[in-house]
Amino acid sequence: MHRPKILMASLSLAAVKIVSGAEVVRPLLVEIRHAPEALIAADGVKAGTGRFSFDSYDHERVLSVVAGNVLTLASREELALMQQDGLEVVVVMESEDKLTLIKRALYGEKLQLDPIYHRYDQIVRRADELAKAHPELITRLQIGETTQFRQPIYAYRLSNDVTRLQERPAVLFNGCHHSDEVMGAEIVVALMEKLVAGYGHEQEVTAWMNSLEIYLVPVVNVDGHNVVTSGHDPRWRKNLRDVNGDGVTGIYPEGVDVNRGYDFNWAMGGTDDPLKANYRGAHPFSEAENCAMRHLADTRQFLLSVSYHSQGEVIYYPWSWHGLPAPDDAVIKAIATDVAAHIRTMNGQGTYAIAPGGPSSQSYPWFYGRRGDFDFIIETGKGSHLFPPAEVPGIVAANLEGVRALLAHAAGPGLAVQVTDATSGQPLVAEVWLPAIENEMVDRRHSDARFGRLWRLLKPGKHQVIVSCPGYRTVVIRDCLVGENSWTPLKVELIRAATTP
């Protein structure tokens, strides 16, 4: 989850006064069925105006608001007030154990996650089956291990020939930085199935696999994902680091927020309080899960990437930094707008929204600011982190339409740069700078070591490009014309600088 608070459901002002007083004992799980639209509050409504708030970092009251039905913890006094208000209220469960009530609300009657969701071992097993059946289309890469239990974190590379790294743009999709946001894993697994099954049969899928390298990380936070999918605790967001060093893990809310651990304005993001849901850890890349993603980015430059979260039906893109947009805002925002327009909301009445996110500690500012990758957080679904089974296929299908839109942008327009040594023809790691676009907010982009390649999405038109490499003469191209619809090739051969005797 990206933003901490979305205000979802309204009750009487008297109920809020009860809530805002001394600590309230809430032994009831209550469902408000068919809540009137007027009782669904807009983002930004403050507590004390007659509304309960759904807070993604808090499980004290409202636990989910899906399809107009509200699941909330309540005291007996609050239940009476809801009934007085004429709401259609059903007591789902009564228990003195708060976790049991939360499990009933988020897991369902069996107090276990519905099997429509995949456990990590099931994901790995299915991916291995696909790789065995189609070894040319999908291969497994171990990119790291989890912080606490040293479980392998896997990425999967898909293309028409995965037996070798190919000289083409790469795109990344990942899920479950936050372990309770399990929808991300479902979307990535569905995409894996689609790519393998569709190659050679669906024209669009075949074109993607023939022109791109597609990387999938279904679950970044494997330890935390296991906590949720095992039925231990549906609230679990963070990894399983034993922060207090007592040798005990899995006691809520211990752990580190994996999506606050990236080294881009790290100290500005999250909190240094270990008890908070967005605890950022001891230092940047303190968590092995973040290091695994960094390792993947070290081995392959990505043109575009998506990190799936829940909830909100919104796409966050880089960024608004003290009110200033990202250097590539014109292109990034256009892509976000297009992708969002292709993802239908759960109620079928609209499409996802877009918003610039903050510039600190999360995946998208790091991938963009440090690596030049246009990275997006897509908050899937609305009103919960664990969605009822009936909602899952629709959310997955809607987001696969977003994948289609995103991958269309991997065809350009922009520059397909290749930098080589003018004498040997060997690829060079060279800085490729567009001074009219890039400023000191972001790191300079470089061609890769294997191919001397850099794919750079740009608006059509003329661009100044400066290519430099230590020991070589700098090349300045003042009016490099980028075409309208596809990649414009730019081959740069650098000449060694004269050495002083």
Model-assigned labels for residue ranges:
Residues 71, 139-142, 154-157, 170-174, ...:
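Structural recognition of the beta-strand scaffold that forms the well-ordered cores
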Residues 183-228:
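Short helix-loop-beta-strand segments that form the rim/entrance of peptidase-like active sites
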Residues 223, 229-422, 429, 454:
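Metallocarboxypeptidase
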Residues 460-471:
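A short, solvent-exposed beta-strand micro-motif common in secreted/extracellular proteins
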Residues 22-111, 472:
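Extreme N-terminal flexible tails
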Residues 426-460:
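Short, acidic Ser/Thr/Gly-rich low-complexity loop/linker segments typical of extracellular
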Residues 115-171, 243-247:
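Soluble metallo-hydrolase cores and metallopeptidase-like ectodomains found primarily
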Residues 470-498:
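Structured interaction patches on ligand/partner-binding surfaces of diverse proteins
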